[in-house]
Amino acid sequence: MLLALLRQHIRPYRRLVAMLMMLQLVSTLASLYLPTVNAAIVDDGVAKGDTATIVRLGAVMLGVTGLQVLCAIGAVYLGSRTGAGFGRDLRSAMFEHIITFSERETARFGAPTLLTRSTNDVRQILFLVQMTATVLVTAPIMCVGGIIMAIHQEAALTWLLLVSVPILAVANYWIISHMLPLFRRMQSLIDGINRVMRDQLSGVRVVRAFTREGYERDKFAQANTALSNAALSAGNWQALMLPVTTLTINASSVALIWFGGLRIDSGQMQVGSLIAFLSYFAQILMAVLMATMTLAVLPRASVCAERITEVLSTPAALGNPDNPKFPTDGVTGVVRLAGATFTYPGADCPVLQDISLTARPGTTTAIVGSTGSGKSTLVSLICRLYDVTAGAVLVDGIDVREYHTERLWSAIGLVPQRSYLFSGTVADNLRYGGGPDQVVTEQEMWEALRVAAADGFVQTDGLQTRVAQGGVNFSGGQRQRLAIARAVIRRPAIYVFDDAFSALDVHTDAKVHASLRQVSGDATIIVVTQRISNAAQADQVIVVDNGKIVGTGTHETLLADCPTYAEFAASQSLSATVGGVG
């Protein structure tokens, strides 16, 4: 998986990689040539007292060193550019794919693990790419070239290489084989600690309200300790790599000096050749060390690549059709459900069964029912946040699955049950509700705020009023009104309010509904509500109970003909004659 991921995302940088490899090749060859020049200086210059040879070869050595340094600097620069671009592209690919996920895929992975995979996991692979960029050509050429040059200098001592290099390779392989499962566990534990932190921060009010700080501390401590222990185990194995490598290099160097000294003493080898052989021996083992350091990063990067590939290979449940359809004259807002049935993944029973209804432009359809009856799921099907498992949802006679999702959603103004606001300003959040090509003016923003009865509390600091993440610096009712204003900005063909007035007092609720009727015009309005006072004003009321429609009609007819609706109304102490605003 790691290789496939690297190959896919490194492709745009092939030219940079080719230049990088060329510079590394020249730099490595220059490094391999230096010990030979040094040996010649010792044997032909110093040993014979030939100053001219020393100066001439010294100049050559200086020139080769300069070339090696320049090429090395260029290789580092290109490697950094390649790594930075690779990391940017991989993060973008993750983000672009994740935003296509429906609630099903998001819930399957969980927000904390998606955040970890998009940031920490990408960082681990980027680290591997940057390390690989420095050893991609250097290590193999230095190793092979060093062996060739060492044999050229003194073939009789090459048996030391045949002993030391395999020992080093086998030892490092043994260490890495133990590190891989530990790194896989570490990434899972990082997800866990992020999940605990997210829960604690998101539910800080609940934690304090129930004085559960101690419990949360213990839960975090357990997750933190588990991660720390896994990291310690992996670190212990990783820490073995450098001592093993150093021990092998030092022991091999001592053996080389010993046996080389014996050959010099017997006149079979010159001092310069021993110095050159030592240099090549060090270069060979250094190449193995560089490869080892890269291999130390490889296990964790491999695990991260598996996790990233899992996300990127997960298809979005709500894909776009090959040949999307769209009404010739634009969306007018006729919404029809024909035998719609929906079952959540893994559930035994459908949450909605055989739902059929029609909502027309210029009318308001209220959907009422007890908690858990399936009201929110029903409007999620209309907005195509989920796809039906049977039946169909049609907008202007076209199945919503045949629309391009962006064009469908641009025709719908949704105010969800939980009104989420993005960090920034009020103006930023209102612009978020604009159409793809819509330039939202300040006048339109203030008009939307007026419709949502939100202009009063925004008036003090204006449109630049700061909004914290999630809108936590506003009350529940204020968040709902800002979310309503955001939906109004677009002037969509279909308005969907999923219990979006629950935090408003009766007076503000009535004011917002009156303003919505004025600006909605011929738009279709679908309201999920728990308030009979809201349902009483609707042109059509749909009563949902246990996933089925048990009543359809006006407020008055349902009071007479639908026991479920009558009980619902009675529970709110509303008389059978109510027809106006409650």
From Swiss-Prot:
All copies of domain ABC transporter, residue ranges: 335-571
Keywords: ATP-binding, Cell membrane, Membrane, Nucleotide-binding, Transmembrane, Transmembrane helix, Transport
Family matches, as Gene3D superfamilies: ABC transporter type 1, transmembrane domain (1.20.1560.10), P-loop containing nucleotide triphosphate hydrolases (3.40.50.300)
Record domain ABC transmembrane type-1: where: 17-300
Covalent S-S links between cysteines: none
Source species of the chain: Mycobacterium tuberculosis (strain ATCC 25618 / H37Rv)
Gene Ontology terms: biological process: transmembrane transport
Domain of life where this protein originates: Bacteria
Gene Ontology MF: a single term: ATP hydrolysis activity
Name recorded for this polypeptide: Uncharacterized ABC transporter ATP-binding protein Rv1273c
Family, as annotated: Belongs to the ABC transporter superfamily.
GO cellular component: peptidoglycan-based cell wall; plasma membrane
Binding sites annotated in the UniProt record for ATP: G369, S370, T371, G372, S373, G374, K375, S376
Membrane topology of this protein: Multi-pass membrane protein
Subcellular location: Cell membrane
Main subcellular location of this protein, as a coarse class: membrane
Entry's transmembrane regions: 17-37, 57-77, 131-151, 156-176, 239-259, 271-291
